[in-house]
Amino acid sequence: RAYKPAYRVMTASYARLLPLLARRETLRQQKEHVFVAIDGMAASGKTTLAAQLEHFYGADCGVIHMDDFFLPLPLRTQERYAEPGGNIHYERFGQQIIAAMGEKYFSYERYDCATGTYSSMRQENRPIMVLEGSYSLHPYFGHPYDLCVFLEISSQEQTARILKRNGAEWYRDFEEKWIPMEQ
């Protein structure tokens, strides 16, 4: 007799995916495409979770990052920054991503805030599309997603992760600017 185990071994980092994977599988039986939004606090693991989903599902998963929709310099005003999510060009995200969710292929302009330039991206609408980053659940978009995830983190862990990822010089920007904008 061939041994057929009824269990699977996975790393602990993937264990947190189980409820999300189960919900996604239920939705997949009802829909050809499942749109997942991952929003949350700075350094809470949004990009990591999106990468884990992309690794798990392989070619069936595409990821769009909200960082590609950072607000360009000419649009940055005090009034705009006073809005929730004002550092994101949510209008462009709505036009180029949300409006194209039903298309087989879509194009968008990826903004590089370090150079202030755009690059054209072409994306196939995969069976699982993950829209990852702060403000991906911005009210401006309505409720276009099939599955919404919001990640939280303690302030102590957030500080440790930001220092490790961005260094002490950038931590001050997070502490004084980006974290307060998320609250």
Regions found by a protein language model. Name each.
Residues 1-16:
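Charged, amphipathic alpha-helical linker segments immediately N-terminal to NTP-binding catalytic cores
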Residues 46:
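Conserved lysine of the Walker
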Residues 49:
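Hydrophobic positions on the alpha1 helix immediately C-terminal to the Walker A/P-loop
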Residues 117-165:
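ATP-dependent NMP and nucleoside kinases share a basic, alpha-helical "lid"
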Residues 138, 167-183:
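Small-molecule kinase domains that catalyze NTP-dependent phosphoryl transfer to phosphate-bearing small molecules
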